[in-house]
């Protein structure tokens, strides 16, 4: 476990000490999708979901999710997030909704988990809001697409 920073020499989990790390600007972009029946997508696009505006609520839920990441994932540091933006794009070819979250901070550790949490919570919210008509929806392809800043530098998924 020598390469895993969240474990000590005995293998016990611990929160990484970032106090000696330099404060730098950091950004992370995560992506994912919710696949659904074409009829479900049409209902969302037409604003006919009984629970309300699915995409607007999912966007807000994603923002809230990013802000609550340290409360949800035990070893994540609470961070001063400076930006959370979500794009939710209906895609008839999927069919479903594509989700992208961008999170920024200026701090001692990155915001990858916050971006991934934002996408995940937005996807879960879409599922929750229309599950009554489509229980077969799939939350899929949730992944880190890009990160920059900090000691490890830049990462771009292929």
Swiss-Prot record:
State where substrate binds.
75-77, 113-114
Give EC number(s), comma-separated.
4.6.1.17
Catalytic center residues: 128
Question: Catalytic activity annotated for this protein?
Answer: (8S)-3',8-cyclo-7,8-dihydroguanosine 5'-triphosphate = cyclic pyranopterin phosphate + diphosphate
A GO molecular-function annotation: cyclic pyranopterin monophosphate synthase activity
Taken from the UniProt record, the cysteine pairs bridged by disulfide bonds within this chain are none
Does the record's keyword annotation contain Lyase?
yes
* The protein's annotated pathway: Cofactor biosynthesis; molybdopterin biosynthesis
A GO BP annotation: Mo-molybdopterin cofactor biosynthetic process
Q: Which Pfam families match?
A: MoaC
- Database matches in Gene3D superfamilies: Molybdopterin cofactor biosynthesis C (MoaC) domain
Keyword Chaperone listed: no
Q: Which domain of life is it from?
A: Bacteria
Name of the top EC class for this enzyme: lyase
What InterPro entries does this protein map onto? Answer: MoaC, MoaC_bact/euk, MoaC_sf, MoCo_biosynth_MoaA/MoaC, Mopterin_CF_biosynth-C_dom
| CDD domains linked | MoaC_PE (cd01420)
User: Which key words tag this protein in UniProt?
Assistant: Lyase, Molybdenum cofactor biosynthesis
Q: What does this protein do?
A: Catalyzes the conversion of (8S)-3',8-cyclo-7,8-dihydroguanosine 5'-triphosphate to cyclic pyranopterin monophosphate (cPMP).
Query: According to its UniProt record, which protein family does this protein belong to?
Result: Belongs to the MoaC family.
Its quaternary organisation is: Homohexamer; trimer of dimers.
Q: What's the name of the protein?
A: Cyclic pyranopterin monophosphate synthase
Q: Which organism is it from?
A: Dinoroseobacter shibae (strain DSM 16493 / NCIMB 14021 / DFL 12)
What is the primary gene name for this protein?
A: moaC
């Amino acid at each position: 476990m020598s390469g895993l920073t969240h474990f000590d020499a005995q293998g016990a989990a611990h929160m990484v000490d970032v106090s000696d790390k330099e404060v730098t600007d950091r950004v992370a972009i995560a992506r994912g999708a919710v696949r659904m029946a074409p009829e479900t997508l049409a209902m969302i696009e037409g604003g006919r979901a009984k629970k309300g505006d699915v995409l607007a609520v999912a966007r807000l839920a994603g923002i809230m999710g990013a802000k609550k990441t340290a409360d949800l994932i035990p070893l994540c540091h609470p961070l001063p997030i400076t930006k959370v933006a979500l794009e939710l794009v209906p895609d008839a070819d999927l069919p479903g909704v594509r989700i992208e979250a961008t999170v920024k901070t200026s701090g001692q550790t990155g915001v990858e988990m916050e971006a991934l949490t934002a996408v995940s919570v937005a996807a879960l919210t879409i599922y929750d809001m229309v599950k009554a008509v489509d229980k077969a929806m799939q939350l899929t392809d949730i992944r880190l697409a890009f990160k920059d800043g900090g000691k490890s530098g830049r990462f771009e998924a292929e």
